[in-house]
A protein has these predicted regions:
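ATP-dependent adenylation/nucleotidyltransferase module used to activate substrates
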Residues: 1-147, 158, 167-168, 174, ...
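AMP-forming adenylation/ATP pyrophosphatase catalytic core
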Residues: 120-126, 132-344
């Protein structure tokens, strides 16, 4: 076998093991480290990550390339995120990173190098050639972040660790003598790392103090701007009128026009029967009107039953579903991820 595969290598254990597995299977593997934009007010981490990726490539004896996609990342992920927050919405930058960078600019670059080459990443996901499939390690499944992958792209994508448990991936890293075998998983914003998103946003969006209201409409505190908060959040605002048991408050609604947050002690919502409208939908399987599916509105949130009203709207059949504008509603039919859209 001499099929060429370009592996997006972040310097982490998942992408490193992905490259090792493909090399072991006889593929012609090329490691690619994607350099993206990082704000100048945070610690630079990409050089260390690239060095880890280079070490792995050297051990595997595969070519290694650094691909500069700073412009594409800044425009497609960071600028998009800032504009969405300015509108009072809560975007998911990891979804945009996959759409615009990993399976956008990177995918197109690979095809320019070799039209028959594949793209591989260290995502925990599988696919059947046309649709995403939930990964073997369901606790690590990342199909929620990958719903934008189209039927044209999927046949050219490989997820080598998608059929493996995370614990086994660590063992494989040791077997291949990879220097990242014990490296911690990355956290935080896609590529950028552990930066606090509010810290990033406040470099671009001015704070605007406003009132925090209880469910009766009484003023009980203050906040620094509704655009910095998301539904269900319980931190970052100040409560001046505390209750006796000091129970936590959760954001249950945002009034962007009046710059007020409404909070409640009860995060559970009566969402059954609510219709969720979507934009920017991508379906790899045509969704059927009247059919019941399962869906989640944020990463790791429990799956809830939904009914397809139209290809751009779904009726929620259960309570405790928080529909956050800007987040993704990702729809499943069993273990098949049929696609999703952005909550309007």
């Amino acid at each position: 076998m001499n099929k060429k595969v370009y592996v997006g290598m972040s310097g982490g254990v998942d992408s490193s093991v992905s490259a090792a597995l493909l090399k072991e299977k006889g593929y012609d593997v090329v490691g690619v480290f994607i350099k993206v934009w990082q704000p100048d007010f945070v610690e630079c981490t990409w050089k260390e990550d690239r060095l880890d990726a280079m070490r792995v490539a050297a051990i595997l004896d595969i070519p290694f390339i650094t691909l500069d996609l700073e412009k594409e990342y800044k425009q497609g992920v960071i600028d998009y995120m800032i504009e969405e927050y300015k509108k009072g919405r809560t975007p998911n930058p990891d979804v945009m990173c996959n759409r615009e960078v990993k399976f956008g600019a990177f995918f197109r670059w690979v095809k320019e190098q070799d039209g028959d080459a594949y793209v591989a990443t260290g995502h925990y996901a599988k696919h059947n050639g046309t649709s995403l499939v939930v990964s073997t390690d369901q606790n690590k499944d990342q199909t929620y972040f990958l719903w934008t992958l189209s039927k044209d792209v999927l046949p050219w994508v490989m997820f080598p660790v998608g059929a493996i448990e995370k614990s086994e991936v660590r063992l494989l890293a040791e077997k291949f003598n990879l220097p990242v075998a014990t490296k911690k998983d990355s956290q935080g914003l896609c590529f950028v790392g552990t930066i606090d998103i509010k810290t990033l946003l406040k470099q671009y969006i001015h704070e605007k103090e406003g009132y925090v209201l209880d469910e009766k409409g009484d003023v009980i505190g203050s906040h620094t701007g509704v655009m910095f908060y998301t539904l269900g959040e319980r931190h970052g605002f100040t409560i001046t009128k505390k209750n006796i048991d000091d129970a936590p408050y959760f954001v249950v609604s945002k009034d962007f026009e009046n710059n007020t947050l409404t909070v409640s002690h009860n995060p559970v919502r009566e969402s059954s029967g609510e219709i969720i409208s979507l934009t920017s939908c991508n379906w790899t399987v045509d969704v059927e009107k009247g059919k019941t599916y399962e869906a989640r509105g944020r990463y790791r949130a429990p799956l809830v039953k939904v009914v397809c009203s139209t290809p751009t709207s779904f009726k929620i059949l259960e309570n405790d579903f928080v529909a956050t504008p800007g987040q993704s509603l990702v729809v499943y039919d069993g273990d098949i991820c049929v696609g999703g859209g952005i909550i309007d």
